[in-house]
Curated annotation (Swiss-Prot):
Name of the protein described by the UniProt record: U6 snRNA-associated Sm-like protein LSm7
An annotated GO BP: mRNA splicing, via spliceosome
Locations listed in the record: Nucleus
InterPro entries: Lsm7, Lsm7/SmG-like, LSM_dom_sf, Sm, Sm_dom_euk/arc
Source organism: Homo sapiens (Human)
Free-text function comment from the UniProt entry: Plays a role in pre-mRNA splicing as component of the U4/U6-U5 tri-snRNP complex that is involved in spliceosome assembly, and as component of the precatalytic spliceosome (spliceosome B complex). The heptameric LSM2-8 complex binds specifically to the 3'-terminal U-tract of U6 snRNA.
GO CC terms of this entry: catalytic step 2 spliceosome; cytosol; Lsm1-7-Pat1 complex; Lsm2-8 complex; nucleoplasm; nucleus; spliceosomal tri-snRNP complex; U12-type spliceosomal complex
């Protein structure tokens, strides 16, 4: 039993390769932000620097607008993190599940 207690829990994600790189984070409730990853812990609490929040459309909470807000240095609570992805190589594509209306 002593061996089990001493066994350290490992995080499901290896975020060490993203240290000092820009990542994008989605949170419960729909908020999104991107910033430079400065630190993290096994509970996925994140420290982001130069953070930018992407504002949502007031009429449609699931749609992001072009508006942003500068937040600077932030600590993101791991329990509210839904998705983490690298900013490099990410591009927006049209939703393939929505029927495109012909004009």
């Amino acid at each position: 039993m002593a061996d089990k207690e001493k066994k350290k829990k490992e995080s499901i994600l290896d975020l060490s390769k993203y240290i000092d790189k820009t990542i994008r984070v989605k949170f419960q409730g729909g908020r999104e932000a991107s910033g430079i990853l400065k630190g993290f812990d096994p509970l996925l609490n994140l420290v982001l620097d130069g953070t930018i929040e992407y504002m949502r459309d007031p009429d449609d909470q699931y749609k992001l607008t072009e508006d942003t807000r500068q937040l600077g240095l932030v600590v993101c609570r791991g329990t509210s993190v839904v998705l983490i992805c690298p900013q490099d190589g990410m591009e927006a594509i049209p939703n393939p599940f929505i029927q495109q209306q012909d004009a």
